[in-house]
Amino acid sequence: MKKIHQNSVLFCESDLYALMQPDVRKRLALSDEVDFPALRGQFRGENLPEIYRRLSEIAGADLMPLCETERQLRQKMRIPADGEQPLTHQQKRFLRENYAHLTTFTGAYEAERFLGLRAIQAMQLRDTSPGYAALGAYLFSQAMWLAREVRQNGYARVNFLARDGYFVKAAFERLNEVLRLPVETGYVRISRQAALPLQFPKAIDLLSLPLLIDMTAHTPDSLLTLLHPVATENARAALAAELPMNQRMDARTQWNFVRIFREKGYDAEKYQQYEKNAKAYLLPMFAGKCATFDVGYNLRSETVIQRLTGTDMTAYITHIDSDLPMRRGVPFRTLYGTSPYVSWVAREQFLLERGAATIGYDAHGAVLGQADVPSSTVQQMQTDAMRFVADMADTFGARLMDMHFRPQDGCAAFEHFLHTGALRAGAEVENAFLDGQAGGDMTRVQWRLMQTDAEQARHPLPKWMRKLQRAAIRLAHDPQSIRRKL
């Protein structure tokens, strides 16, 4: 067997994913009639001598020397024939040193997974800009995660929720041009602002309002604007009689707001009309077995969709930020098993559609929106990211589905970017009309630094992160302060 790979820093794509290439038999110096990796992949189990005896018969060549090679590799790697185990640093180093041999053994699942990640890394080294290498690999990994789920679960349709599902949808559709999965895609314009009034079918349901949004980040006037679709004509006058309309609420006045609005401001007939408007928009997009995708984080929109449409749906989100989704009754799956350190606006601004944010629905089921202007930096990153997705699709084609890698690993570069460069790249984030602001949850605008008070006491944040945290809080309440600082 030829050692043509050696320990090159950057392999070409065909070398990196040798298992998927038609000329692999030539590079491995085997019989011209035998595609050994594809042939080897048909046999599973621990009885290697028997497997290689049968392989030799099929290939018409003596392949028994490879049996000992694979046995030694398995012994060193401790790779079971029909299972998956995480790699240690020592095993990963061994993989790098023995890359050429490992490409021939498709039974070594962890090796295949490693090769898939190496293919992504090789593409990233073509262009190390954050849009291409970081955001591009992130979109590709999320789209491949969804593609595998679609194939495994047989969804008839995947609906991507606006607006942070837009570019994941674009990536999924670009990959599906070569994967050809029998699935339809849709784009559902919904937001926290549009969905908020739909969570109060009855006046008594308003008691849950403080649990749905951070009311202390609002004034009675701003909160009434969010509840306008279900508010009576005299709601403002009733609130103004007892509360200062332009002063932020505290823990006491928020309950006064709930009491007053529930007794004097809620209009059940307007709710029925608004629900009818929303159903007219949503129902045509949810038929059969469906899946939805959203970045996160608490399944608020998905819960409303399921209640209004009664559809059989599974929600796919990047991660959750509390245990609230587990109490909502909507089946869901997450890409990340834990919440990342940096999320919310820091993540979403790179995924947002260059279009209007949804703020409601009219009587004809049409969407009401409010436009924004994304920063030129973010727009360029999004363009570069889609180039990465297109390059992966064009390079590997339908074989993408056979590329074993953990999507979480493919997202690592973007997570690193969020830690180190997102604030600089997203300095113009205040230009965006963010869905977090629209949904009445100003805390969503803060950067997600996942530490509880107890964790901060045991492991204090570094100075640079504390400064970032303070800057993020200023951004939530005074966007212009960031511009002045920068």
Residue ranges and their predicted role:
Residues 2-79:
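Flavin-dependent oxidoreductase catalytic core characteristic
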Residues 38, 57, 75, 82-485:
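Long, low-complexity, Lys/Arg-enriched
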